Structure formats: C-alpha cells, structure tokens
C-alpha cells in the first residue's frame, strides 16, 4: 500500500484555475464516495478550500492510483487528464506525509502559519470518516497530523503575529486599548480593504461599527452584508466624537480627516483615546494629528513595519516547526512497519491460547475431581508458560518490522509456527469491498 497526495494550490495554479477545481460543500460527500469506488483507491480524503483542492489517498499501486485520481478530478471539473497533471503536484510516501503535515500546520499557506487550514483539514477528515472512505492508515495519520499542528501552534505561537495590513490595523488598536469588545469603530470606505478591516474588527469582538462612504449605497451594501451600521461621509465629524477606532481606506485625493476636524472634536471627547489607522495611499488622514493629546495616528508605513517584524517572527516559528517534521515522518513509518507484524503476533497468540485451552479441556476430562481453585492455578500457570515461550518469538517478529525483507521473513516466521495472518493490504481491500456495498445501499435507499 502507498500514500499519495495530489494537490492543486496557489503555487501550481492561478486563482482563475483554482476557482474551476473547487468542490461545493454539498458535493463533497458524493465526491468522496465516487473516488472511493474507483479502482486502486483503498482510502481517501478530499480537501477543498478557496486556495487548494487536494486528494489524499492510500492506493494499492502508485502509478495506477495516481492516474485514477487525476482522471477523477478531470471528470469532476470538465478537464482533460493532462490539464490536471499540468496544474497539480504529486507527492508520494514520505513526501506526501510531509506535505500533509506542512499543510495542516499552515506552513504551506499563502499566509504563513494561518490556523484556518487546521480546521479545514479536520473537517475534511471527519467528513471522509463519516462517509466511510478512511481506514486504519488515515484514521491514524490524520489524527497525528492534527495533533502535531495543534502542538506546533501552541508551542511556537506562529499565528499570534499579524501579517496582513488589515489584521495589523486591529492589532495596533489592541495595543492601545487591550480588549476591544466594548469599543466603537468607524470604517471609512467600502472596498476590499475596508471589508477585511471590518471582518477583523468583528473578529475581535466589536459589534458597534459604522461604515461611512462618499457613495452611501456602497456603505449601505457593506453594512447590510455584515449586519453593522452605516452613515453618510458628511456625518463623520459627529461620529468621531464618540468613536474609539477609525480605519480608513479610500481612493480620495485629499484628506478625509484633517487636523482641524480632530481639534474641533477633541474638546468634546473628554481626553478619551482615539486610534486613527490610515491604510490608504494616498493618505486619508492628515499627518501630524498624533501631536494632539490621546490621538494615535498610524499610516501604512507604521503597519508595514509591524507586518514585516511579525513575518520575521512567523518565519522563525515556521523553521522551528519544520525541524520537527522529520521526527513525525519517522514515527509514522514506524507505526506503518508494525501494521504487518501485528496480525502475525495476534495469530501466534491465538494459536498458543487455543493450545492452552485444549490442554485445560484435556485436564478437566482426565482429572474431573479438581476443585475450582486448583483449576484456576493450573490455568494460570499454563498461560504463564505460554507467555514465556512467546516472549522471544514476539520480540523477533517486532524486530522484523524494520527489516528490508520483512515480508519474506514474516512469511517464513508464519511457516515455522504454522500460522496464517491476513496482511494489511488484504484487510484494506476487504474493508473497501464491504464499505462500497454500504455506499451503494445508502445511495439506493436515498434514491428511493
């Protein structure tokens, strides 16, 4: 069995292409089932976000599995197989495990170290698990990847430092006020940066937000979308008298907030702090306002300095996380190597315990007068003999797991002890056959 990951992401395809190869949420369960029923696929998880569509699969043969996954993606989105090959990257074995660990921990994201992808990976795994397309390997591997990512984030705090201008703007406000939940905020502008700033303010707990814009219809549209207030730009001076935070991002060619405006409203603010954050170029807020008591004025250069410093911190944290990945891959490989040994050890134990049970039956027949206490003592000691006899063979079987010729030697081991253990590959195939029947029955029932 082999682990393969096929990824269409921000490195391999532009946004126009990525938009065409994204699964709708309501189509993902059927997509999991369709792929699982495909030849060569033994387990699968599909991840589909705005920045990546990925298929993780356990396959019986690498080349066959890769082809059928690429064909599945081509058919799902109306492309040729060669098109999918051109816009995707393929990882196999250790590289596929490394890719999953990097994706889950945010090291492969456009925004380095972001945490949203961890939740998306978890949701994708849970959906696949509930659909029935995961088995022994993915149930273990995805839990390992999720645990690793959580630990990495907690130990390095990689996501704590803002690396987007809109998020950094909110972080600056937090430096002044601490918690923002009870504060009042104004968003000037109704474009993309304004919306991102609005979302970050909402994420910080602020609910009292007013959007103002020269075109009132645009302000109304943005406010309605996120269930906040809106007002005309002419109302700005009055709004400033009670505001705590102002984030401005317009394309105006002259200052929207001037020194004169702030001086007029400062008298009515009773020394309350006001944070002005200007992310527009050219600037919306007149420089020099910071000279007024309790007025904090930041522009894009201030934000860029914070973002650059934070990015350096994230890069250092990412390097620390990357150093931990080889150990995770090694741990996974050790676990995988034991998969073939466990059924052999189980079969050996079952045979030995069957012999012990037969021996006890024989003793019961030949010595019918034994008391219950005597019988328990004999049973205990015969089991002890069995365990002592099995100790060295089991140790040898475990050591075979790391041998390059482990399959051949495990087969010899089984012949010596006259036992027969089902290999993980056969177990996976039988599991798939059973689950495919369940999926088919579920579809028939749903259709009826």
UniProtKB/Swiss-Prot annotation:
GO molecular function, one term: glutamyl-tRNA reductase activity
Pathway(s) it belongs to: Porphyrin-containing compound metabolism; protoporphyrin-IX biosynthesis; 5-aminolevulinate from L-glutamyl-tRNA(Glu): step 1/2
Catalytic-site annotation from UniProt: 50
Record: residues binding NADP(+): 189-194
Any Pfam family hit: Shikimate_DH
Subunit and partners: Homodimer.
Protein name per the record: Glutamyl-tRNA reductase
Lineage of the organism: Bacteria, Bacillati, Bacillota, Bacilli, Bacillales
């Amino acid at each position: 069995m082999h682990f393969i990951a096929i990824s269409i992401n921000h490195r391999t395809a532009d946004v126009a292409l990525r938009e065409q190869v994204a699964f709708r949420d309501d189509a993902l369960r059927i997509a999991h089932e369709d792929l699982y029923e495909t030849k060569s696929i033994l387990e699968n998880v599909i991840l589909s976000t705005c920045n990546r569509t990925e298929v993780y699969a356990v396959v019986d043969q690498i080349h066959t599995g890769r082809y059928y996954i690429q064909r599945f993606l081509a058919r799902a989105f109306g492309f040729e197989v060669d098109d999918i090959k051109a816009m995707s990257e393929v990882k196999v074995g250790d590289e596929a495990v490394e890719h999953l660990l990097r994706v889950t921990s945010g090291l492969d994201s456009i925004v380095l170290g972001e945490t949203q992808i961890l939740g998306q990976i978890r949701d994708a795994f849970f959906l696949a698990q509930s659909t029935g397309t995961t088995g022994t390997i993915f149930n273990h591997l995805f839990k390992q990847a999720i645990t690793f990512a959580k630990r990495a984030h907690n130990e390095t705090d990689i996501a704590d430092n803002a690396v987007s201008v809109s998020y950094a703007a909110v972080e600056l406000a937090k430096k002044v006020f601490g918690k923002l939940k009870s504060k009042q905020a104004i968003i000037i502008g109704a474009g993309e940066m304004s919306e991102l700033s609005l979302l970050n303010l909402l994420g910080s707990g602020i609910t009292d937000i007013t959007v103002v814009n020269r075109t009132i219809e645009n302000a109304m549209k943005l406010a309605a979308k996120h269930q906040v207030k809106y007002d005309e730009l002419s109302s700005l001076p009055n709004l400033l008298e009670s505001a705590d935070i102002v984030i401005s991002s317009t394309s105006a060619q002259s200052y929207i907030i001037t020194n004169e405006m702030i001086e007029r409203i400062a008298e009515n603010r009773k020394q309350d702090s006001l944070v002005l954050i200007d992310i527009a170029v050219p600037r919306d807020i007149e420089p020099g306002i910071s000279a007024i008591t309790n007025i904090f004025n930041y522009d894009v250069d201030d934000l860029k300095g914070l973002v650059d410093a934070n990015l350096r911190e994230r890069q250092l944290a990412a390097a620390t996380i990357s150093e931990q990945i080889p150990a995770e891959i090694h741990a996974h490989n050790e676990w995988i190597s034991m998969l073939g040994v466990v059924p052999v050890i189980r079969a050996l134990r079952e045979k030995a315990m069957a012999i012990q049970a037969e021996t006890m039956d024989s003793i019961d027949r030949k010595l019918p007068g034994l008391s219950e206490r005597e019988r328990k003592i004999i049973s205990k000691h015969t089991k002890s003999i069995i365990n002592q006899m099995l100790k060295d063979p089991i140790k040898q079987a475990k050591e075979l797991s790391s041998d390059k010729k482990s399959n051949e030697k495990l087969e010899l081991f089984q012949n010596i002890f006259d036992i027969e253990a089902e290999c993980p590959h056969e177990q996976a195939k039988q599991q798939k056959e059973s689950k495919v029947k369940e999926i088919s029955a579920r579809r028939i029932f749903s259709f009826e």
